[in-house]
Amino acid sequence: RPDSGKVYVDGKDIFSLKEEALTIFRRRKIGFVFQAYNLVPVLSVYENVVLPVELDGKKADREFVQEILDTLGIREKERNLPGQLSGGQQQRAAIARALAAKPAILLCDEPTGNLDSCTSQDVLGLLKVSGQKFAQTIVMITHNEEIAQMADRIIRIEDGRILSAGERGLV
């Protein structure tokens, strides 16, 4: 919880929510992209992508999922298992999974940390396109200055304290 202030997402003060409501909020409104992908190895790409939606007791929007897979360039891999994919394809599947529930916010923890520089640029471009296309806020954690400079806004944090915040080029 924040030391001061409030956090609003979709008009709701999320820290005024009770624990159960906050859990539901996280599941429905926040997509997570992990550095290590965290794909389930025995599930196909498609099954991994729709898993969070189905765990929420909902039916996946197949047309929307296909659109995401097309946008990320992995639709032809939807029946493959994660072990049959390159690192970049696995990261794209992880991004697709984060997008499938149509979250308001994507939290990306070093999404290019395990990728080569060419694949990293592809993934960053896809995140930007996805954020614009699906109207999402993307919060990305990175230690890479080049990647940070691609953001619209940069917040530098050290030891849990904000050192600086502002528009790209001004921080």
Predicted regions and their residues:
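Conserved beta-strand-loop-alpha-helix hinge in the C-terminal portion
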Residues: 161-171
